[in-house]
Amino acid sequence: MTVHKNRFRRSRSLSVTHRIQKRPDHREKTKLYLQLKLHDLHAVFNLFPEYEQKFLAIIKLPITGKEPIDVPFSLSNHHQHTCLEFSPYANEQISKSACLHCESVSVPTSSDAMVAHLNQVTNVMQNRFYFYGFRKDMELIRMSAKQPTIFQIFYIVHNTINNIFPIMFEKKQKLGMHIVFQSRTLHIPCECIKQIIAVSSGYNVYLDILQDSVILTVLCETLDTNTNIHIDIGMLQKKLEEMDIPNEISDRLEKYKGHLIGFH
């Protein structure tokens, strides 16, 4: 009887050991990963070069919370949950968890921006800095009615970051926009970038540096001709014809317009 019990215990113990070996717990997995040596990774990357780039992209932000970026920088290359920071010393993506600037920042949603677009005819003075960027060019105004994305991006940025200046232009019979951030030191919150990306389907949106300013450029690549979004463009044009552009704004427009020729 005793022998039988001992055999049962031993077989049960072997069974449990077998299960543990087949399914290592979290601590064992972690221990296994820590045993990987640099030459092991090097051997893997030699066989699969594409994994090296993925590995580097994964580890950069968690280690320092920051990753350097090159300009021009397309928002299509933006890492989720990171802010963008520009200065004369460095241009970086910063992990939201490591960001010290965004706690009190309120960013409009893409839906807020669309509502504002639909109401822009009745809120011309409220949105006057947007309309200054058209320099009373009625053809550009007409084009803007078919491209709500332009207004939405301006609205999101303008309500998040102060001291910006839009300049509208035509490229390939589509409306484009430069937003000039009038400082070389700039922090763009993660949520602001997220909302811009949410509305910019069919557009190329990128950041660059011109002299002492950071420039956000919006270029339309694919125009949505099936949009059901309409505004009273005739009434809008009439109001803009009557709107005065301050001399200071006109001078600034001419200054930036000269610098931005050929920039896009």
Swiss-Prot record:
It is found in: Host nucleus inner membrane. The keyword Transferase does not apply. Forms a heterohexameric complex with NEC2. Interacts with capsid vertex specific component 2/CVC2; this interaction directs the capsid to the host inner nuclear membrane to initiate budding. Pfam families: Herpes_UL31. The keyword DNA-binding does not apply. Residues 1-22 are annotated as: Disordered. Keywords: Host membrane, Host nucleus, Membrane, Metal-binding, Phosphoprotein, Zinc, Zinc-finger. It comes from Human herpesvirus 6B (strain Z29) (HHV-6 variant B). One of its GO terms (molecular function) is zinc ion binding. Plays an essential role in virion nuclear egress, the first step of virion release from infected cell. Within the host nucleus, NEC1 interacts with the newly formed capsid through the vertexes and directs it to the inner nuclear membrane by associating with NEC2. Induces the budding of the capsid at the inner nuclear membrane as well as its envelopment into the perinuclear space. A zinc finger (CCCH-type) spans 83-187. Phosphorylated at serine residues in the N-terminus. This phosphorylation regulates the localization within the inner nuclear membrane. Signal peptide: none annotated. Belongs to the herpesviridae NEC1 protein family. Residues 1-12 have a biased composition (Basic residues). One of its GO terms (cellular component) is host cell nuclear inner membrane. GO terms for biological process: viral budding from nuclear membrane. This is Nuclear egress protein 1. The lineage of its organism: Viruses, Duplodnaviria, Heunggongvirae, Peploviricota, Herviviricetes. Its main location: host cell.
